[in-house]
Structure formats: C-alpha cells, structure tokens
Amino acid sequence: MDFFSVQNILVHIPIGAGGYDLSWIEAVGTIAGLLCIGLASLEKISNYFFGLINVTLFGIIFFQIQLYASLLLQVFFFAANIYGWYAWSRQTSQNEAELKIRWLPLPKALSWLAVCVVSIGLMTVFINPVFAFLTRVAVMIMQALGLQVVMPELQPDAFPFWDSCMMVLSIVAMILMTRKYVENWLLWVIINVISVVIFALQGVYAMSLEYIILTFIALNGSRMWINSARERGSRALSH
C-alpha cells in the first residue's frame, strides 16, 4: 500500500474508545516532529530539516482527510522552516552564528502579547468563517493546480477558544523560534498542555500521550535556552 496513504496502518493502538489506528505517514511525520523539537532545544540547525519533513507529511495527511485550512497552515510552517534554516545559518565575519539565544526586549514582548491577545479574541469569535475562508482558498489553489478536490462539509469548531489559542500561539512561537527568542519555548509548553487536554476530552488518547512527550521536550528546551540566554547576559523583560 502507498506509504503516503493514511489507510496504510502501521499499528493499532488500544487506547481510548475503539483505539487509534496509527498510519505509517503519521508515525514518520510524528518522529520527524519529535526530532525537530529535540534538535531545536539543542540549538541544532538540522532541526529545520526534520521540521520540513514533519510539515510536509502532515500537509499530505490533512489533504487526505480534507482539513484544507490546516493544510494551508502547513504551507506557512514550511515557509517558516525554510526561513529559520536561513536565519540560523547566517554567520558573522568571525564565523559565529549571527543569531544568539536571547529574551525578547520588554517593548517587543508587550507587542507580541498584544498581538496574541487580540488575535486569539478575534479568532475565537470568527474561527468558523476564518477556517471556511482558508479552506476555500486552499481548494481554489489546488483546483488551479489541476487537483480534483471539492469543498468539504465543515463542522462548527467544538473548542473555538482553545483551538484559537493553539493556532495563534503556534504561529507566534514558530516566528520567535526562527529568531532564537527564549519565549518560543514557553509558548510551546502552553500549546502542548492545551493539546493534551483537548485530545483527551475528544478521546484521542494516543495523540494526548504524544503531546505529553512534547510538553516535556518543550520544558527541557525552555530550561536549556533560559540557561543559554543567561550565559550571554540576556535577561527576561529587559529594555
């Protein structure tokens, strides 16, 4: 069976109601995601290679299960990984990395906080029409590329506030990671904890377990980057 098909099941995980069928493509994509985050915590530029694999495979998954808005977000994360790879690879004349791990200056931190609060508020109110719009855009693009796709039937979001938090904070965290700001890890911790709870409430315990692992990786990343920033003289919320 085709490796890229979500019907190509690697293993049935007997967790939750009915268990969970883990496909090969999801398993490989998940492993790539774990490697990406683990390497990022070590400040290894190779994290972006695995990040590209992760978002590409999950983009294919979202295409197959007709989550076209999520597919479009993977396009953003793909571009962010490319930019992050470039930004992290830049060096000074002394052949040192141009970007250093540091905290956001207070004015920037407050600006990003305002962006997050306003964006989450707006997304909570308009998440259904926003995802409908993103889905239509994705369908139009794919149809223009010659793919035989139709507009899927969309269901109202079951957790509009929490899904808005995860979407907005994921975008902001990815942007901050490409610039080596410590705060990205704090956001990933929040995102992962929310994901653990949401997937558990939906009965998808295998995914909830995966995000528990991601939470511990993000906590370790926070610890390591905070120590690295301290060694470089960077302090949280400094001017």
Curated annotation (Swiss-Prot):
GO BP: any one term: nicotinamide riboside transport
Q: State where the protein is found.
A: Cell inner membrane
Task: Topology check: give the Periplasmic ranges.
Answer: 43-48, 90-109, 178-183
Q: Which UniProt keywords apply?
A: Cell inner membrane, Cell membrane, Membrane, NAD, Transmembrane, Transmembrane helix, Transport
Membrane topology per record = Multi-pass membrane protein
Q: Which residues cross the membrane?
A: 22-42, 49-68, 72-89, 110-127, 158-177, 184-206
Annotated beta-nicotinamide D-riboside binding lies at 188, 192
GO CC terms on record?
plasma membrane
* Top-level lineage group: Bacteria
GO molecular function terms listed in the Swiss-Prot or TrEMBL record: nicotinamide riboside transmembrane transporter activity
Q: What ranges are annotated Cytoplasmic (topological domains)? A: 1-21, 69-71, 128-157, 207-239
What induces the gene encoding this protein?
A: Repressed by NadR.
**Main localization category:** membrane
Main role?
Answer: Required for nicotinamide riboside transport across the inner membrane.
NCBIfam families noted in UniProt: NMN_trans_PnuC, PRK15397.1
Q: Into which family does the record put it?
A: Belongs to the nicotinamide ribonucleoside (NR) uptake permease (TC 4.B.1) family.
Q: What is this protein called?
A: Nicotinamide riboside transporter PnuC
Question: What are the top taxonomic ranks of the organism?
Answer: Bacteria, Pseudomonadati, Pseudomonadota, Gammaproteobacteria, Enterobacterales
Which gene is the coding source of this polypeptide chain? pnuC
